[in-house]
């Protein structure tokens, strides 16, 4: 063999025109090093340098061009000289130009002398100029522009990674806690992006137009006078606007700002060129945001679902393998987290094993049942207490802090404390860890939903109470009359004392004279037309006048006369009741109740209170507990880090539910607080940093891993649920409630949606508006909803049917693939005689074949003998046919044919779910039994095909052999000339009686077909003939493998000859030795798998890829591409077919072998024989080395002459 690293020359076989005898050729071993050096000396050093640079080029996707011209071309020609190749396309030339430019760029970094670099650069530039001359300048500029654009896009993609917010922080958390914890922060960032989008929409279409309209309003304008009551802060409110209680309740400056619903006016904004209706924009933006949120969530879920469906169905078959190979998180970089994940995987395997095993019966099941019942009763009691507490907080009245913020504080405490109590109660139930996590999530979700709707109900009750108070305040308390409407009169009753003589009492009345003073008129009367007011305004709503008239009343003086000493003074005590004073909103005192702002203030306080409670809980529960566990552990009686209270866990599921609940509050309060998403953005940013700091400082990964990556749509399903829950109260308010008359953009409407009808009336015809009203009536909407429900049901049924059909097709493909693999492995390792036919996991009765008679072809016998497999112990590469089945045989226990027939006659037993589906009409009751019958029939059909495959006639068997061995016709060698006569005589008669002889193969190959003929070799003794009758027919393939794997010799007779096996006990599969003999008994019989020509090992060794792997030469890709010639052309013309037929007839008449066949493209040569296996030397040691060389096919063979 040549030395490693040298360029090995090609081996050429020179044949004469007649093809009678082949001249001797040189083998690879006969090529001297001087000849190799002489060939290498003809190669230019500059070209070698360019080749080395070209071999290191980054353009690896460009495949080298294979020259298909004359096979006798010189391999040492200039590889870059392609000027004569006029058939090259422009794209190919551009690729070559790009390659040469890369070579020039890499030339500077090569460790060469400067003279060598300059010389190489000169040659490369010259070739580059030649190639560029073949392409127009515009094409070059276009290619260069495309390349620069690709580089710019890659640079932008790399820059985009640095622009993603908190990407580095999330990756750091991922390295410490894994992808499960980082998925929460990724979801947190996604929710923040949604809130930023919602804020942008509300600011662009609602907030900014209202702010522009107010900025253009001046003091005394019509808009200023109409909006003064809702936009100008009264002096009494301004005096308390800076107090902490006012700011905490979002009053004062917050109340009279763009933050709440009541600040927006119902006036139309008249710009310089446009007329913008803010109420219409307010209504449509809220509806659009809800629809937009639903769309992006569904879009994200669909994308995750598409990625999830790419996984194969094998994940449901090999559960433990998938758990083992996919259970590790390779993003972890923290040893502590790695230990937690390791233990989690161990627990996961234990759980899976326990699930598969039969669960033992519980000794005391009633104790567990009672504990679970009590636990669920206690949890239900907690739900009732939560509802009662929220309802009671809504009825509290008072001026103190707790009364004003009772609802927000109560909901925040319940949200914070109750999930931890649920977790403790769940441990009493002793559920499976996976089920315990599911129950925990379900209970927390139910708690959030109850709190959500209890809050809405409490707010509605407060609204009704305030509405009643407002209606009571509308009644007049006192009536003030005009001063000129009554005449003042003073009456004095005097009781005179009785004189001593005459004690008769007398009563005297005195009347004060009343004088009337004329009042001059300060203003003249104005004549007003019926349709116009006093100011010339059309159809005024109200008119306010001011009267400065001064009234003067007469002064009446009374004087007491007569003695008063005998008057008796009587004191009368009278108590007048005083009414209770209640705190009312300023909007109510100004003539109306703005209940939308009140609800918005409550929701805003709830959102901000949740932020305060979350930060406080992180600081107290996580941070202080972590400090105590860290620094008090040395002085405590037990281990604080491992028992109680231990470090806080980062609970992904609870944190996700908390985030989803917060987003539901945002969707609920968006209609009443347009800038609530902006406040939520600030809250989410604060929580991102707080939770990230707590995770890296105080928390440890949860012991029970929440697999969010396996069900990535879990987060978004919760968002969909809360979005649906928040649309119900908002829709109820829009459809049934009456807007406030004193504030908001819908103050002059009877309903919130009336603003749409007003716009339609103003811009459309009355007939068209009436048609729209009729189309939106309940008589049309209800049938449409029913129709949509039926369509949805039909689509669901269709999708279910398609999914079932998809599963059936996947199962069929799996079965077909399994059968094909079985056939391939049978061809690779020899057909194995099946004592038990195992199809679809069920045992079939053994089919006994009758013994062969004299009229049966020997090919059938050889086929049956070939199916007999020897022991597979010790084999290295022969796979087991039982392990290739991809069907999950979970219930494939062995059953007899009698039990199968009995079971098939009985109706299938349906589960509870199947009965329910059959009851509601979603499933066919016959499909369950019919599906099994179809599988049994298909399995039986395939079994009959496999069992009767060996009983076909000899013609079908020969065609099957020839088709199977077509792929090996370039590798299997022919036999020598000495066995041609015997092979010709035996090939003429195919149906002969079997005799005590040994079988061997003759391979006759022409450009169209490959003929495989079994031959018989008569034994020299009767004893040997009797033993040879029982010799397995796999020795035929062993002989072919021996001819294939024998060392390369210098003559055709040795190379294509065949040695007759004289003794059947001699192992024909032993490796070749230095004396070209196959008698070395070192190779054990099980290693026949490596020598089988149909085995996958031999196929792999004959593949062209092994030429690159096993060879030690350093030839370039271009050189290797030229080494593989095209296959010989298949003749199609009548002349060629006649010539081939004539050659065949001549060969059959002469009884001789045709001319020397075309040499194979591949040759496998082996090193010296393998050593016997030992402790130091394994049977698969690297001493055995396979090398494959590609040879050139000779010229087109001409017509051969017979001897």
Swiss-Prot record:
Q: Which residues are glycosylated?
A: 225, 748
Instruction: Point out the coiled-coil segments of this chain.
Output: none
Compositionally biased residues, Basic and acidic residues: 927-945, 1133-1147, 1172-1203
Q: Specify the protein's topology with respect to the membrane.
A: Multi-pass membrane protein
Q: Where is the composition biased (Low complexity)?
A: 898-908, 973-997, 1022-1035
Q: Does the keyword Hydrolase apply?
A: no
- Can you tell me where the transmembrane regions are? 191-213, 276-298, 369-391, 406-428, 441-463, 665-687, 714-736, 780-802
Record's GO cellular component terms: plasma membrane
Give me the stretches of Polar residues compositional bias.
865-874, 1061-1076
UniProt region (Disordered), positions on chain:
1-39, 64-90, 826-908, 927-1039, 1059-1087, 1112-1203
Pfam families noted in UniProt: TMC
- Give start-end positions of Acidic residues composition bias: 73-86
What GO molecular function terms would the record report? mechanosensitive monoatomic ion channel activity
Compartments in which it is found: Membrane
Q: Does the keyword Transport apply?
A: yes
Swiss-Prot/TrEMBL keywords: Glycoprotein, Ion channel, Ion transport, Membrane, Transmembrane, Transmembrane helix, Transport
Described purpose of this protein according to its UniProt entry: Probable ion channel.
The entry sums up its family as follows:
Belongs to the TMC family.
Query: Any idea what this protein is called?
Result: Transmembrane channel-like protein 2
Source species: Caenorhabditis elegans
User: What gene is this protein a product of?
Assistant: tmc-2
């Amino acid at each position: 063999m040549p030395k490693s690293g040298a360029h090995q020359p090609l081996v050429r076989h020179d044949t004469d025109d007649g093809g009678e005898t082949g001249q001797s050729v040189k083998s690879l071993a006969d090529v001297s090093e001087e000849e190799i050096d002489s060939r290498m000396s003809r190669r230019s050093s500059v070209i070698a340098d360019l080749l080395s640079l070209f071999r290191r080029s980054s353009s690896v996707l460009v495949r080298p061009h294979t020259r298909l011209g004359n096979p006798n071309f010189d391999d040492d020609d200039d590889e870059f000289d392609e000027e004569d190749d006029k058939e090259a396309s422009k794209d190919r030339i551009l690729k070559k130009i790009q390659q040469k430019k890369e070579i020039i760029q890499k030339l500077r970094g090569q460790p060469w002398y400067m003279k060598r670099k300059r010389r190489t650069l000169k040659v490369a530039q010259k070739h580059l100029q030649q190639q560029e001359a073949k392409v127009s300048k515009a094409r070059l500029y276009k290619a260069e522009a495309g390349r620069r654009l690709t580089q710019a896009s890659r640079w932008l993609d790399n820059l985009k990674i640095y622009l993603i917010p908190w990407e580095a922080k999330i990756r750091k958390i991922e390295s410490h806690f894994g992808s499960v914890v980082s998925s929460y922060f990724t979801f947190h960032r996604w929710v923040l992006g949604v809130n930023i989008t919602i804020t942008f929409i509300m600011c662009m279409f609602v907030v900014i137009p209202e702010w522009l309209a107010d900025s253009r309003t001046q003091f005394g304008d019509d808009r200023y006078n109409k909006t003064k009551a809702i936009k100008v802060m009264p002096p009494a409110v301004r005096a308390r606007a800076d107090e902490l209680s006012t700011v905490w309740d979002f009053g004062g400056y917050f109340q009279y700002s763009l933050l709440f619903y009541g600040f927006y006016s119902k006036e139309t904004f008249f710009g310089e060129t446009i007329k913008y209706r803010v109420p219409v924009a307010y209504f449509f933006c809220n509806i659009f945001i809800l629809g937009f949120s639903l769309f992006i969530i569904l879009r994200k879920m669909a994308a995750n679902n598409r990625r999830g469906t790419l996984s194969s169905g094998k994940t449901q078959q090999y559960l433990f393998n998938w758990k083992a190979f996919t259970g590790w998180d390779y993003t972890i970089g923290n040893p502590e987290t790695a230990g937690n994940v390791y233990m989690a995987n161990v627990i996961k395997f234990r759980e899976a094993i326990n699930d598969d095993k039969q669960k033992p019966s519980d000794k005391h099941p009633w104790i567990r049942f009672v504990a679970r019942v009590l636990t669920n009763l206690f949890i239900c009691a907690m739900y009732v207490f939560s509802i009662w507490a929220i309802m009671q907080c809504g009825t509290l009245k008072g001026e103190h802090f707790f009364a004003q913020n009772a609802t927000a504080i109560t909901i925040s405490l319940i949200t914070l404390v109750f999930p931890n109590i649920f977790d403790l109660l769940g441990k009493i139930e002793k559920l499976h860890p996976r089920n315990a996590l599911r129950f925990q999530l379900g209970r927390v979700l139910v708690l959030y939903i109850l709190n959500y709707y209890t809050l809405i109900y409490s707010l509605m009750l407060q609204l009704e109470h305030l509405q009643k108070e407002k209606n009571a305040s509308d009644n007049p308390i006192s009536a003030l009359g005009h001063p000129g409407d009554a005449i003042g009169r003073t009456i004095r009753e005097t009781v005179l004392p009785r004189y001593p003589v005459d004690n008769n009492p007398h009563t005297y009345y005195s009347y004060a004279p009343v004088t009337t003073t004329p009042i001059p008129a300060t203003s003249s009367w104005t004549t007003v037309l019926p349709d116009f007011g006093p100011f010339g305004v059309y159809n005024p709503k109200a008119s306010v006048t001011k009267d400065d008239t001064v009234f003067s009343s007469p002064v009446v003086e009374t004087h007491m006369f007569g003695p008063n000493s005998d008057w008796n003074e009587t004191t009368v005590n009278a108590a007048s009741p005083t009414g209770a004073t209640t705190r009312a909103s300023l909007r109510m005192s100004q003539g109306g109740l703005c209940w939308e702002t009140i609800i918005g203030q409550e929701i805003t306080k709830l959102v901000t209170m949740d932020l305060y409670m979350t930060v406080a809980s992180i600081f107290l529960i996580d941070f202080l507990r972590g400090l105590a566990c860290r620094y008090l552990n040395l002085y405590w009686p037990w281990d604080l880090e491992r028992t109680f209270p231990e470090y806080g866990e980062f609970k992904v599921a609870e944190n996700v539910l908390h985030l989803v609940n917060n987003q539901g509050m945002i969707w609920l309060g968006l209609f009443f607080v347009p800038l609530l998403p902006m406040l939520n953005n600030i809250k989410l940013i604060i929580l991102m940093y707080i939770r990230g700091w707590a995770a890296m400082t105080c928390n440890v990964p949860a012991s029970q891993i929440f697999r969010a990556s396996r069900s990535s749509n879990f987060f978004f399903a919760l968002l969909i649920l809360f979005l649906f829950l928040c649309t119900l109260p908002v829709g109820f308010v829009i459809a049934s409630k009456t807007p406030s008359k004193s504030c908001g953009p819908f103050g002059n409407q009877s309903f919130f949606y009336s603003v749409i009808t007003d716009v339609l009336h103003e811009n459309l015809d009355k007939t068209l508006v009436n048609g729209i009203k009729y189309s939106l009536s309940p008589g049309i909407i209800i049938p449409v909803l029913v129709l949509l429900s039926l369509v949805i049901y039909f689509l669901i049924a269709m999708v279910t049917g398609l999914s079932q059909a998809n599963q059936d097709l996947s199962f069929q493909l799996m079965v077909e693939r399994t059968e094909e693999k079985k056939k391939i492995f049978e061809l690779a390792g020899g057909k194995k005689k099946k004592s038990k036919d195992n199809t679809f996991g069920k045992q079939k009765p053994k089919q006994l074949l009758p013994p062969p008679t004299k009229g049966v072809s020997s090919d059938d016998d050889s086929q049956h003998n070939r199916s007999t497999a020897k022991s597979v112990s010790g084999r290295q590469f022969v796979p087991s046919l039982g392990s290739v089945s991809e069907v999950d045989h979970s219930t494939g226990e062995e059953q007899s044919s009698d039990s199968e027939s009995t079971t098939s006659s009985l109706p299938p037993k349906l589960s509870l779910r199947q009965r329910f589906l059959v009851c509601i009409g979603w499933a066919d009751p016959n499909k369950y039994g019919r599906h099994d019958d179809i599988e049994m029939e298909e399995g039986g059909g395939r079994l009959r095909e496999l069992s009767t495959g060996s009983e076909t006639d000899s013609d079908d068997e020969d065609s099957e052999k020839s088709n199977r061995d077509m792929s090996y016709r370039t590798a299997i060698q022919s036999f020598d000339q000495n066995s041609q006569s015997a092979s010709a005589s035996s090939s003429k008669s195919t149906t002969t009686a079997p005799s005590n002889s040994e079988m061997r193969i003759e391979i006759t190959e022409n450009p169209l077909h490959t003929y495989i003929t079994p031959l018989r070799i008569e034994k020299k003794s009767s004893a040997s003939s009797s033993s040879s009758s029982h010799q397995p027919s796999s020795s035929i393939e062993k002989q072919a493998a021996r001819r294939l794997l024998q060392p390369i010799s210098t003559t055709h007779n040795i190379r294509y000859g065949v040695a007759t096996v004289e003794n059947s006990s001699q192992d024909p599969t032993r490796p070749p030795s230095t004396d070209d003999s196959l008698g070395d008994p070192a190779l054990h019989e099980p290693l026949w798998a490596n020598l089988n020509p149909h085995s996958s090992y031999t196929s792999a060794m004959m593949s062209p890829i092994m030429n690159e792997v096993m060879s030690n030469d350093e030839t370039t890709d271009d050189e290797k591409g030229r080494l593989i010639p095209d296959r010989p052309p298949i003749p199609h013309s009548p002349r060629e077919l006649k010539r081939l037929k004539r050659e065949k007839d001549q060969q059959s008449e002469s009884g001789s072998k045709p001319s020397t066949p075309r040499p194979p493209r591949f040759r496998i040569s082996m090193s010296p024989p393998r050593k016997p296996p030992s402790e130091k030397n394994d049977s698969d040691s690297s001493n055995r080395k396979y090398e494959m060389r590609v040879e050139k096919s000779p010229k087109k063979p001409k017509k051969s002459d017979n001897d």
